[in-house]
């Protein structure tokens, strides 16, 4: 799969998930090419405003309905509106994410391991494997 350029990034490093939302994001591994982050969001919890500079694959350990809001508080995604939830053991793709919060609006935790690709962006923006 050929590498593609990342989109221009204009947000400060202070909004990076590890810096801005450390209660829900934990670094597991980092190199020049990849960064692996564990994300945990408990039921009823909302993350701090943060970004994800690099696209990557998310390995789902547990998933729940969520609401993602932009920096102005506007709803960007509400999975309760019919979007299918990823099942444990599946892998989903996530593109770069500008400043946002994520609220777990369900009764089970969100727990994913993200593999952020620092120097390339796969062509497909949405794919599932199980």
What do the PLM-derived regions correspond to, one by one?
Residues 1-39, 43-49, 76-99, 103, ...:
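A short, N-terminal "cap"/entry segment at the start of jelly-roll beta-barrel domains
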Residues 51-72:
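Short, conserved beta-strand element in jelly-roll/cupin
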Residues 56-58, 71, 110, 122, ...:
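A ubiquitous, low-specificity "background" feature that marks scattered single residues
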């Amino acid at each position: 799969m050929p590498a593609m350029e990342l989109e221009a990034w204009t947000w400060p490093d202070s909004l990076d998930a590890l810096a801005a939302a450390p209660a829900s994001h934990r670094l597991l591994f980092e190199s020049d090419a990849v960064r692996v982050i564990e994300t945990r969001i408990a039921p009823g919890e909302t993350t701090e405003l943060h970004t994800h500079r690099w696209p990557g694959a998310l390995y789902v350990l547990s998933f729940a309905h969520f609401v993602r809001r932009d920096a102005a508080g506007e709803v960007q995604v509400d999975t309760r509106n019919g979007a299918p939830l990823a099942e444990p053991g599946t892998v989903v793709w996530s593109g770069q994410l500008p400043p946002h919060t994520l609220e777990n609006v369900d009764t089970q935790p969100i727990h994913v391991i993200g593999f952020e690709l620092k120097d390339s962006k796969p062509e497909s923006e949405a794919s599932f494997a199980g």
